[in-house]
From Swiss-Prot:
Species name: Photorhabdus laumondii subsp. laumondii (strain DSM 15139 / CIP 105565 / TT01) (Photorhabdus luminescens subsp. laumondii)
Gene: der
Lineage, top ranks: Bacteria, Pseudomonadati, Pseudomonadota, Gammaproteobacteria, Enterobacterales
GO biological process: ribosome biogenesis
This protein's name: GTPase Der
Residues holding GTP 1: 9-16, 56-60, 118-121
NCBIfam families: GTPase_EngA (TIGR03594), small_GTP (TIGR00231)
Family the UniProt entry places it in: Belongs to the TRAFAC class TrmE-Era-EngA-EngB-Septin-like GTPase superfamily. EngA (Der) GTPase family.
InterPro entries on file: G_ENGA, GTP-bd, GTPase_Der, KH_dom-like, KH_dom-like_a/b, P-loop_NTPase, Small_GTP-bd
Coiled coil (UniProt feature): none
Residues annotated for GTP 2 binding in this entry: 213-220, 260-264, 325-328
Chain ranges of the KH-like domain: 381-465
Length: 493
């Protein structure tokens, strides 16, 4: 089984920096603010061929209040989940009371615990780490996570019980044998890549579902309702999720990765540097997702921020499902008013399913996954060229394209140009000059004909040059005789 390593410690000791270095991503927000990581975040990492799962947690400083108490609880849960705990301390800041409190908790757990002194670059290491021996956790491993110094050696040491090294027989190869083995491996890799492309089936991959919306619309409550556990910090204060949290799950035999994002608020209200980071992470999560679940607060209605977020989702070409949350407790009159407003302001995304839910009580949440799967299946469905060309000609017969500069537009054939979102490429003469109204007509015609729901369709137009423009036909003997008779007739005139 792949080992699980948890990073714990006070806020701002460098846990997220180490997480990012090990996972080779920027999935954890990193800046010089205490308390940046509020939830536990999972990542897959590999050091010297040894794979492991790393958990980044919120900091514990012993003075938790409000949401900070929840952060501490998330860190303690991560300790229980882990096989190995890396207890990180700040060599520059020195020993703090919270370090003693965390060490006391760890000593009471039967976990492999390693004391890691970070930020040792530019200091006298022996002097800086000496006081941490009073924590009673044995050897101290000094690293500089921001520069990577000591990180590989640390991970190799903590993973040693899981590596199984020392069992393998070392075989010496000659230079010729090593070269032959290398090129054989490269050839095999190329063959496997081709086979993987031919056999690609999107249903075998985890479906990435990004849950997005303004702050405090109930995204984390919905995530926890779906998961059935308090996995993401939920606290009635806008902005309690500052980072995008990637959470693997399984439902009805299908694998998913839920992405719970920080809320996106009006640009003028984004003041803290950390919140600007969070907006970027939300937009990156949308780009990374297969399906986006946009959560709207029924009691606040559709705001400009919601429409801005919708615009970004559409520009990204992602499949879309809309969840109108906090539907419980509203009067029938208010519900009808909200529905009318949705019809009016969301008419441009009429392809998206809209669900009315209560994330807090669970009503309507189960039905979301029918629409999520429908949207993903429509976005990744393979359609052959003959069917797309037939639909194109049907659309042309039902509504002829307008004349362009006195000439009739000729659409020749259509084929698939990509998936997620579905792209239809139409080839022909003057097709790029078609008016936007006719392009929208074609897009809607393809959508209806293919029964596509939950995902935008993109139509691309290409004009091919005449392949015979610079070539002269080779005439048959019969054609040559006809040509001579025609030329003789023209001369007589």
């Amino acid at each position: 089984m792949i080992p699980v390593v948890a990073l714990v410690g006070r806020p701002n000791v460098g846990k997220s920096t180490l997480f990012n270095r090990l996972t080779r991503t920027r999935d954890a927000l990193v800046a010089d603010f205490p308390g940046l990581t509020r939830d536990r975040k999972y990542g897959r990492a590999e050091v010297e061929g040894q794979e492991f799962i790393i958990i980044d947690t919120g900091g514990i400083d012993g003075t938790e209040d409000g949401v900070e108490t929840h952060m501490a609880a998330q860190s303690l849960l991560a300790i229980e989940e882990a096989d190995i705990v890396l207890f990180m301390v700040d060599a520059r800041a020195g020993l703090m009371p919270a370090d003693h409190a965390i060490a006391k908790h760890l000593r009471g757990r039967e976990k492999a615990t390693f004391l890691v002194a970070n930020k040792t670059d530019g200091v006298d290491i022996d002097t800086a780490i000496a006081e941490f021996y009073s924590l009673g956790l044995g050897d101290i491993y000094s690293i500089a996570a921001s520069h990577g110094r000591g990180v590989t050696q640390l991970i190799e040491r903590v993973l040693l019980p899981f590596s199984g090294k020392g069992e393998e027989e070392v075989v010496e190869l000659t230079e010729e044998e090593a070269n032959a083995a290398y090129w054989a491996e490269q050839e095999q890799n190329e063959i496997e890549m081709v086979e993987e492309e031919e056999d690609f089936d999107p249903s075998t991959l985890p479906l990435k579902l990004a849950i997005v919306g303004k702050p405090n619309v109930g995204k984390s409550t919905l995530t926890n309702r779906i998961l059935g556990e308090e996995r993401v910090v939920v606290y009635d204060m806008p902005g309690t999720t500052r980072d995008s949290i990637y959470i693997p799950m399984e439902r009805d035999g299908r694998e998913y990765i839920l992405i719970d994002t920080a809320g996106v608020r009006k640009r003028g209200k984004i003041t803290e540097t950390v919140e600007k980071f969070s907006v970027i992470k939300t937009l990156q999560a949308i780009e990374d997702a297969n399906v986006v679940l946009l959560v709207i607060d029924a009691r606040e209605g559709i705001s400009d921020q919601d429409l801005s977020l919708l615009g970004f989702i559409l520009n990204s070409g992602r499949s879309l499902v809309i969840a109108v949350n906090k539907w419980d407790g509203m009067s029938q009159e208010d519900k009808e008013r909200v529905k009318e407003m949705l019809d009016y302001r969301l008419g441009f995304v009429d392809f998206a399913r809209v669900h009315f839910i209560s994330a807090l009580h669970g009503s309507g949440v189960g039905n979301l996954f029918d629409s999520i799967l429908e949207a993903y299946d429509c976005a990744t469905r393979r359609v052959n060229t003959s069917l797309l060309t037939r639909i194109m000609h049907m659309a042309e017969e039902d509504h002829q394209p307008p004349m362009i500069r006195g000439r009739r537009v000729k659409m020749k054939y259509a084929h698939a140009g990509g998936y997620n979102p579905p792209i239809v490429v139409i080839h022909g003469n003057q097709v790029t000059d078609l008016p936007d109204s006719y392009k929208r007509y074609l897009m809607n015609y393809f959508r209806r004909s293919l029964k596509v729901m939950g995902t935008p369709i993109r139509i691309q137009f290409k004009e091919g040059a005449n392949p015979y423009a610079d070539k002269r036909n080779t005439l048959t003997p019969n054609q040559m005789r006809k040509r001579k008779r025609l030329m003789a007739h023209l001369k007589k005139r």
